[in-house]
Amino acid sequence: MERTIAAISTALGVGGIAVIRISGNRALEIADKVFFGKDKLSEAQTHTVHYGFIKNADGVKVDEVLATVMLAPKTFTREDVVEISTHGGVTTSKEVLDTIIKAGAYMAMPGEFTKRAFLNGRIDLSQAEAVIDIINAKNELSQRNALSQLEGALSGEIAEVRDKLVYLAAQMQVTIDYPDEDLEDITIDDIRRISDECRKKVDTLLKTADSGKILRDGIKTAIVGKPNVGKSSLLNSLARAERAIVTDIAGTTRDIIEEYINLNGIPLILVDTAGIRKTEDVVEKIGVEKSKRSIEDADLVIVMLDGSDILDDEDREVLAQTHNKNRIILINKSDLGESKYTAAVKAKAGKSPVLEVSAKTGIGLDKLAELIRDIYSLGELAAGDSAIVTNMRHKSALADASEALTRVVEGIDIGMPSDIVSIDINMAINSLGEITGETVSDDIVNKIFHEFCVGK
């Protein structure tokens, strides 16, 4: 990390300002070459802002700027950092960056600033991953959870469990290495009890992973039904935009339409599908097959029925194809009067909630959000104090740790020797260390930071 790096940290495009970040042991020296104000930045106090101009090597003014000086170690990277706020716009910010690079800085790689924060011990790996989750957050709940992770909520819970296991492993190793010494041995009951407590804590975190993934990525929700029941109208109503064509002609939607929406804080990836029915039309038939695949791929299925019509064989076929999925059954067109078959559908719906709505007027759609929140326990997540696992890498590591600790408890119960039991305890320690970065490989670290944008 001897190189001093620089990059534009704000999104490229037209805006009020752009920020160019410089980090490294030559940050102040390089900034002094390009920044001209009342005082040299190398003589400034930490965390101070200075007015001046950026000039290129020929002494030509590039822009009027504000420069913020932050001295190590109290910076994001724990290195000397200078952030230069320029006028927004692609041309100006790129010209300022080019001037800084020519003065001796190196162009930062994707995620290199955050990687330096990790390597310099300011944040652990799970906190580094939270940075990109904050940037990519699509709703308030996921943003709040990512911020909590950045502040160390998940790291703290992982560290608490891992520290107990490290202590346990150390005590066991002493007993194994010096069996004849008169040492204060840890009992087998202590090993079992602590291991089981740690396993339960790991499992508690693991249980949040499925809901956590939804917070991060959204619920893939397929809207299905026979033609002309109001699927496209529902998509348009929820998206608050005319995303799908709506006509009285059956079979208008022939391909899949996807739309990301935020439904009262719930992230949904809505998939409007072609009407499911038997057809001889080649193009429509392809659309129907895609609809069936959408049902298989969906996290949640919304089955649309036409409450103004009779319940026919095509409706029953859709209900049969979705009975094993997380689903909500919507009886549409309630604005035309009460459906005559609502009670019959509820009787055969099993655990699937049934709701009368009007995609045209919006009646009942507020209750749809409540149902989805209940199905995925999103209300409990929002109200909970514990960390939420949103990253599949973390989920995999927690699952490995849980399995190892389960083997510890089961091994003790059948009289397994301590040196064998200790192997699984160390496996659990390593798995938990993968989350925070203590035991992770360089390849994984590089892969994680490669997913970042340049400038972060």
Describe each model-derived feature in a short phrase.
Residues 67, 107, 221-223, 246, ...:
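Generic preference for hydrophobic
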Residues 284-308:
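Inter-motif core of Ras-like GTPase G domains
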Residues 2-8, 12, 52, 140-262, ...:
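C-terminal-of-GTPase-core extension/linker across diverse P-loop GTPases
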Residues 239, 274-275, 299, 306, ...:
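Short glycine-/small-residue-rich Rossmann-like dinucleotide-binding loops
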Residues 1-144, 148, 152, 328:
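A glycine-rich (often HGG/GG-containing) alpha/beta subdomain
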Residues 106, 267-269, 353:
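Conserved beta-strand segments of alpha/beta enzyme cores
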Residues 50-63, 67-71, 252-279, 297-300:
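Switch I (G2) and immediately adjacent beta-strands of P-loop GTPase domains
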Residues 270, 304, 330:
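Generic enzyme active-site microenvironment
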